[in-house]
Amino acid sequence: MNYVKKALYDEMLSFYHTTLGMEHEDRLRLRGQIGHLVRVARKEIPDTLETKAKIHLLLQLFYGEWGFHCDPESYFLSSNLYLNDVLETRRGMPVSLGAILLYIADKLNLPLYPVNFPTQLVIRAEVEGEVAFINPWDGQYISQALLHKWYEGAMGFGMTLTPTELAIANVGDLLGRFRQLAKNALIREEKNDEAFCYIARLIHYNPEDPYEIRDRGLVLAQMGCYHVATEDFQYFIDQCPQDPTALLLKNQLEELKQDTYPIH
């Protein structure tokens, strides 16, 4: 299947470059780190093995020998989304660990693909007509029964899990998930400069996206630039009047309009 498995990895690179100003030396260091993992994987996983065995060995390497993991105590920190931090500490969240795992799998020609599941990123393995699902949190296989429990927990009791929810992710939806997680983390940590730079890049490619403009308004409000923030909020309310966020912002808009601060 022709699928851009490294799209998520590339977005992590872009996130790092946009928000922290990745230098040439940083890029070379990251290339060396990920290249080393690929070389080790190629050495440790014999090409003569069947595909299922190769996938199993890759998971053992990634989560066992290399020690990639998720820490529930620091799950939503932005450091879990920065490629340099994840490669250095071997700690991330499902979307970032999954991005690195998919990148390596692509280099090894292994049939692993992302699933944009409601609760988190899930990895889908397709081998000779069989399908299995892997939790990028810890590399364990996930049963259909457990996936159904996750789905009910997210969508409501009695909701039916359909093949659509388990299909290979649309790249645009996948990148959208990463971008929202990244924005949320930066805004929550009040890393306003980084958040503003990242959102500005996203708006450059989608200048009329009301959700990106809303998020820019949230950052501007945190920076004290209320006058400019209200313009973004008003645009979002006009474009998405039925969105629950629009109703909340509408109630706060008049209060914000009373404060006018210049951008500085």
From Swiss-Prot:
It comes from the Bacteria. Gene3D superfamilies: Tetratricopeptide repeat domain. SUPFAM superfamilies: TPR-like. It holds the Pfam family TPR_9. Belongs to the UPF0162 family. This is UPF0162 protein PM0557.
